Amino acid sequence: MIDETVEEIAEMQTHSSSVVAIKAARALLALGDREFPTVEEYERALERNSDALRRANPSHATLQTTQRELVSRVTESDAETVPAAQAVTEDVVAEVVDRVESAKRRAGERAAEFLEDGDTVFTYDYSSTVLEALTAAAEAGVSLSVRCAEARPRYLGRKMARTLSEFDAFDVTLVVDGAAGIFLDDCDRVMVGMDCIVEDTLYNRVGTYPVAATAADVGVPFVVVGAESKIVGGGFAFENEQRSAPMRLVDPVVTDDAVHEY
């Protein structure tokens, strides 16, 4: 299971950073089905497999932080037996998964407050946190027109469009990326997720920058939604510079903890 998860993350089949972090955390539970002669052997296996999961995508901030937390908390628990160490792993994984899932939900609920009945929203890529925001608005009785860009080359915007089309509250239009400028002018706001924010740079799916620049040109607010843990002050290197966009184009950033104005 761990090897399969590593391969899946490396091939970008899992696209949401929260989903990646949860999958990776749960993958470590597979070590609970194995036998180890000593606690030290178990901890080495935990560290080795966690390192493999982190290396599969070094640019996912949530993946990196949750994996480091898992390993450190298990090794610092001073478990005296292998079953005890495995039990600690189960508890920490459950806690981490709950926190990641609740952060996404809280950020989505906070972002939903920016949406008013009859608004037209432009989305780019597939973000589970943006999906949380839109569905929270729908549950509150808000009807929206949603323009979903395809987000080539993986066409993840198509998945967003298909998912949203299942809700009666949404009037969904799938837009080719090259036509974003035409549709943005009629939108009330753009809403996207994030891989992370490092100092003055937003990292997200390739193609986010031109959407943000076009939104700024036509005066449409560019709202970024995600977990507070994805805002990194420094000491974290995002490896794919093609995913960057300057924070001067963003306003605001909505997280589970706060609304940040830039």
Predicted regions and their residues:
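Conserved phosphate- and dinucleotide-binding cores of soluble alpha/beta proteins
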Residues: 149-262
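Long amphipathic alpha-helical segments
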Residues: 1-98
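Gly/Ser/Thr-rich loops at beta-strand to alpha-helix junctions
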Residues: 18, 121, 125-130
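Ligand-binding beta-strand-loop-alpha-helix segment within the catalytic cores
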Residues: 68-117, 130, 144-186, 190
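Histidine-anchored nucleotide/phosphate-binding helix
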Residues: 127-139, 212
